[in-house]
From Swiss-Prot:
Function statement: Nucleotidase that shows phosphatase activity on nucleoside 5'-monophosphates.
UniProt cross-references to NCBIfam families, sorted A to Z: PRK00346.1-4, PRK00346.2-2, PRK13935.1, surE
Enzyme class: hydrolase
Compartments where found: Cytoplasm
Gene name linked to the record: surE
The protein's name: 5'-nucleotidase SurE
Keywords of the record: Cytoplasm, Hydrolase, Metal-binding, Nucleotide-binding
InterPro entries in alphabetical order: SurE, SurE-like_Pase/nucleotidase, SurE-like_sf
Presence of the UniProt keyword Lyase in the record: no
Cofactor dependency: a divalent metal cation
SUPFAM superfamilies: SurE-like
Length: 259
């Protein structure tokens, strides 16, 4: 397959390099990744400023471009410039391997997940993948899983506007029990800010937080990881609350006319 590989940790991050080296054993891989770290930038794109895509001179079995933008920018450049200039299109967009998990409400902030969703908007089957350890992630486990997953899973089954969000426990591959289909959980953060003083005597604030995991759903994404499984969650860009919409339509119909 032809693969467009992006991330939010940056073009030289070990996660994307590990993924590229594994995937290029059996696939054609083009890396289009931010020239600097873009973690938690969400689905931002660059407007009213130029973008640069610089091909790197590397001794690797894949191509690598450093892009002066966000993960979503990297997907746009990868599809509309890099692959287009080759006269082909990727069969799948893969975003990762991310340093740290993207579970529950993480997906709202994640540049990694947004990279996959940008591919989904463009109509290319897309996958985001993260390893659930920020300090010492075992990327090889995620890379080996990806290579095997692409053999057994037909990416064409992923519809437009939908992506797979994959989270991998940071343990040796041999310790993984398998993978489970899961739902995006209500896992979230209770944030607070610590007031500090900079070297010039001015106040600044450092955001900290506690993880809240109280979702009763047995298919909640984070529960699969706690049980030693890889979590595979289909997510979509559409955010309409269908249940509330139906309830409000029962009260207001289509809405209310002012005139």
């Amino acid at each position: 397959m032809n693969i467009l590989l992006v991330n939010d940790d940056g073009v030289t991050a070990p996660g994307i390099l590990c993924a590229a080296r594994y995937l290029s054993k059996e696939h054609y891989v083009v890396v289009s990744a931010p020239e600097s770290e873009q973690s938690a930038v969400g689905h931002g794109i660059t407007l009213r400023f130029p973008l640069w895509a610089r091909k790197l001179d590397i001794n690797e079995p894949f191509e690598m471009y450093a892009v002066s933008g966000t993960p979503a920018d990297c997907v746009k450049i990868g599809l509309d410039v890099i692959y287009k200039d080759k006269g082909i299109m990727p069969d799948v967009v893969i975003s990762g391997i991310n340093r740290g998990e993207n579970l529950g409400t993480d997906v709202v902030y994640s540049g990694t997940v947004s990279g996959a969703l940008e591919g989904a908007i463009a109509g290319v089957p897309s996958i985001a993948i993260s390893v659930a350890d920020f300090k010492d992630p075992i990327y090889e486990t995620g890379a080996r899983f990806l290579l095997n997953f692409l053999k057994e899973f037909d990416v064409k089954r992923i519809p437009r506007f939908t992506a797979l969000n994959i989270n991998v426990p940071s343990v040796p591959y041999e310790q993984i029990k398998g993978w489970k289909l899961t739902r995006q959980s209500k896992r979230r953060y209770e944030d607070y800010f610590e007031k500090r003083i900079d070297p010039y005597g001015k106040d600044y604030y450092w955001m900290l937080g506690d993880i809240i995991e109280d979702d009763p759903d047995p298919k909640a994404d984070y529960k699969a990881l706690k049980e030693g499984y890889i979590s595979v969650t289909p997510i979509t860009i559409f955010m309409t609350n269908e249940e509330l919409l139906k309830e409000l339509e029962g009260i207001y119909g289509d809405g209310k006319n002012f005139r």
